[in-house]
Design a protein with these regions (language model features):
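Short N-proximal segments of mature Sec-exported proteins
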Residues: 32-77
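Bacterial signal peptide processing site
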Residues: 22-25
Length: 116
């Protein structure tokens, strides 16, 4: 074996070994995410009607609604983050904010529909 081949081999062995350590973030099946979002959205809708006291501001009720749907949000976060938890904190913050926005808008729409 020539010196060049030995040198190339000594460089490739650590590289190939490190490739086994690469993080693989596999995306969940799209239908699973849709199903989990639908479950979360249904939870938000149920709890808007159940928790709205018609006195508190919409954002306060929205926060209570999101808290009531924490299990649905966590299931969605876990599915998107995958088994390795890749970017779980960031995904959790985004889903929490999305849920809060949706819940607050649902409170506003719910109140408007009661008035008409």
């Amino acid at each position: 074996m020539s010196q060049a081949a030995k040198r190339l081999g000594s460089l490739l062995i650590p590289f190939v070994t490190l490739c086994g350590c690469a993080v693989v973030n596999s995306a969940p099946p799209p239908q699973e995410v849709v199903q989990l979002r639908n479950a979360r959205d249904a939870c938000l809708a149920r709890n808007v009607a159940a928790l709205d006291d018609y006195r508190s501001d919409a954002a306060t009720i929205g926060m209570a609604v999101v808290a009531a749907c924490r299990y649905e949000n966590q299931a969605l976060v876990s599915a998107i983050a995958g088994p390795d938890g890749f970017r779980q904190g960031e995904i959790s913050r985004q889903i929490e904010q999305n849920s809060l926005d949706a819940a607050t808008q649902s409170v506003v729409a719910h109140r408007a529909s009661r008035r008409s």
